[in-house]
Structure formats: structure tokens, C-alpha cells
Amino acid sequence: MITVDDATEILNRFSLDRRTYVELKDSFGRVLAEDIVSEIDVPSFDRSDMDGYAIRDQDLDGRRFKLVGEMHAGGDLEVAIGEGECSWVATGANIPDGANLVVPVENTEKIGDDVIVYEPGKEPHISERGCDMKQGETVLKMGCIVNDRNIGILAALGIRNVPVYDMPTVAIISTGDELARINDVNSITLSAIVAQSGGSPVFMGTATDEISHVKHKIKEATKCDIIITSGGISSGKKDLMPIVVSELGGVLFHRVKMRPGMPMLAGMIDEKPILCMPGNVTSCLVCGHVFLPPMIRRMVHLPFAGLGGVRRARLSEEVVSEYGMRRYLPVKLVDGVAYPTFKGSSLITSIGHADGMVVIGEEETIRKGEVDVQVL
């Protein structure tokens, strides 16, 4: 039997450094696989920040200017101004040749073809070409996570296909003859954890307890980067996964010092990791939350510090744990109090109603009072 930490270390040896391109609209949350270097100046022209009149600042000794043109945002009309002249400019419009100052419209008065400037102000109200981003500038670094803010930088540069680290494909198989009579829960819950962690779940269907059927399903699943199964890893006659993994590849560990989830098995087939979760729904979910996020997030170059974070709470009751086993206790949080929800590893509501888990270490047997809750 292996500790949780040792099992995690073994699984973290698997890596993935595959890169791909995704459309800009699909890049949110992905990790950049290369530096983003601007190929253009942004803005690409001297741009007005205000509605008003563009003039030459050296002409400010006079307060009356002759209106010689209009510039609108998106327009392609070219205007040049000389001594004592001005041009109307809209916000976002190109600055006319010769102008270096925009007087806000509220500080002026138009009289016929003339414009009177009452108060020019202290700011030029012009965004110069390249003041936001310059051609050749590295604007985002490799390893940066695309978020709701810097995705705007990519859009401003006109980037339509974004270089990112590829998501690992994760094959999911539930095993057991009983799945012909009951609903398959584990495939659904595991796929949600995979997606939340940054992977791409691939449903492979269910397998019966016939060893040939299980082998066929797993061989088919080796097209993916990771294989996950549930069921068939305890000590019953139909618990075939240890045999199947040994014959198709090799077992890395079997049984982990944790509850729930102790029967957990991991191996390697065709250089691909295979994680065999317990069939009991809460045990399966706990193993999924413990082992999948750190492994998958490493593969997509995302940081991992617990997906939901940690909250401090007070246990509603004293909890007894088995010495030498790390216990993951599902709890519901209400007004700073953590109420245990565990009713049995085979019952989905044991974790389905939980907001997080309290981890009780291998050296502890009793836990009470203030605790850290790993939010799910």
C-alpha cells in the first residue's frame, strides 16, 4: 500500500508538451505556448481621444480658427491644416496632418465657418501611434493564462488563431455488469472533473465484467493521452482491472492509504497513464478530485493550488479517523460551520451535497474544532 503523496509523485512523472492553435474565441483559460509579439502599432495612427477640433498648438495665440475639414472614426478622408486652421475630429478619428492638439468641443463655439476656442486645456487629447503597443514588442509571455483582460490584447492585435498548450484527451470507461441495470454515474462525474481540470473528456462507454471486453475497451482508449476506469479493482472474482493492466502494460501502484478510495490503482499502457478508480461513487469522486486535477493541470501548464481554494470553518462534530490512513471527509459549509455529509462510499449524496472536503492526516485519529476545508 502506498501513501497519497507517493502516489501523486508517481502520477506527476507523466507529462505532455503538445502545442496547438485555437480560435481566439476559444482561447479563454488556455495557456500560451509561445510569446506574443506585436506585428503592428496600436493604435496604428495618431488618434483623437475626444470630440472636438484639431489645431496646431503654435497657433494658440489666436483664438479664432478657420474650419477646413471633418475627420470621423473609420473614415478614410485625408485632411491637412495650416496656420490658423482647424478640423473637426470625432473620438477615434485620425488626426489631420499638421495638427498636434485637440480642443474638446465643449470648450469651443462654431460661428459660420469659424471656430472660437475659449479654453484649449492642458492635455493634447491625442493617442499617438504605438502608444498602446509597438510593432516588435513582446506583449504577452509564453506560459501566460488567457483571461478576460488580456484576451483583449490578442483581439487588438488582430490575432485570430492563438498558440496554446494542447489539452490532454482523457478516455473514461465505467466497468461492471451492473451498469446494464443501473445508471452510470462515474463516467459523468469523472468527465466533469477532467473538464474542470483543463482536460478533454472522451466517453468510451461501459464495459462488462468479461476480461476480453475490458481489454478491448482499454486498447481502444490508448488513442487518448490518459485512461480512466471505474470499478473492478477490489478483491472480488469480477475485479479484473489489476489483471488487465498487468497484461496490457504494468501496474505502478495498487491500494492507497486513503479513505474513501483505498482500492485505487494506477498503471501504464503504451506509455500512457491509466488510473483505475473504485466503483463506489463517492470513492470514485474523491479519488478523482485528489489525483486528476494536479496531473492534468501540469500537462496543460496550469498552476495547481486546489481548484476551489481553502476556507476556514469549524467542524460541527468530533470526527474519528483510522491511524495511518488519510481521510477525505466531505462537508457542507453553512455560516462558517462544516457539517459532515458522508453516509457511505457507495452513496452519491455523501459527496453530492458537499461543498468541500476536510483532510485528516495519516498521523491524526481525531479531528475537531477549526479546520481547513478544501472547496470543491
Please provide the spans of the model-predicted regions:
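Intrinsically disordered, low-complexity, positively charged segments
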Residues: 1-64, 145
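Predominant activation on well-ordered alpha-helical scaffold segments within soluble catalytic domains
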Residues: 8, 12, 51, 105-106, ...
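Helix-rich terminal scaffold detector
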Residues: 1-4, 160-277, 281-287
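Flexible glycine/proline-rich
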Residues: 2, 8, 20, 34, ...
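Short, glycine/charged-enriched hinge/interface segments at domain edges or termini
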Residues: 13, 53-205, 338, 342, ...
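Short amphipathic
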Residues: 20-22, 26, 66-67, 139-141, ...
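Solvent-exposed alpha-helices and their adjacent loops that cap or buttress functional pockets
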Residues: 46-48, 59-60, 78-82, 95, ...
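Short, hydrophobic/aliphatic alpha-helical segments
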Residues: 28-40, 76-88, 266-267
